[in-house]
Amino acid sequence: MTEAKKSLKRTLIGKVVSDKRAKTVTVLVERRVKHELYGKIVAKTSKYHAHDEKGEYKLGDTIEITESRPISKTKNWVVTRLVEKAVLV
């Protein structure tokens, strides 16, 4: 019984769209779903507020967030890792 225990917490990958608040980033997560009636693949988006303790993630970064205990009224997610750094032009 040395199996790795699967986490029950959800993880999502999204792009940072705001980093203006202290210790908080706003993450835009896009998912693709099939329209029930017409069958077309449609992109749906959701915004989540995630806890960023050190303030290290910046606008445009792609990050992974994990569900956690409520941190504030709107914050129930914590930044887990950086997937891709934003490219500065």
From Swiss-Prot:
Intrachain disulfide bonds: none
One Pfam family in the UniProt entry: Ribosomal_S17
GO biological process: translation
Domain of life (superkingdom): Bacteria
An example molecular function term from Gene Ontology annotations: structural constituent of ribosome
GO CC terms, sorted: cytosolic small ribosomal subunit
CDD domains associated with the record: Ribosomal_uS17
Gene3D superfamilies linked: Nucleic acid-binding proteins (2.40.50.140)
Keyword terms, alphabetized: Ribonucleoprotein, Ribosomal protein, RNA-binding, rRNA-binding
Membership in a protein family: Belongs to the universal ribosomal protein uS17 family.
Function: One of the primary rRNA binding proteins, it binds specifically to the 5'-end of 16S ribosomal RNA.
Quaternary organization: Part of the 30S ribosomal subunit.
Record protein name field: Small ribosomal subunit protein uS17
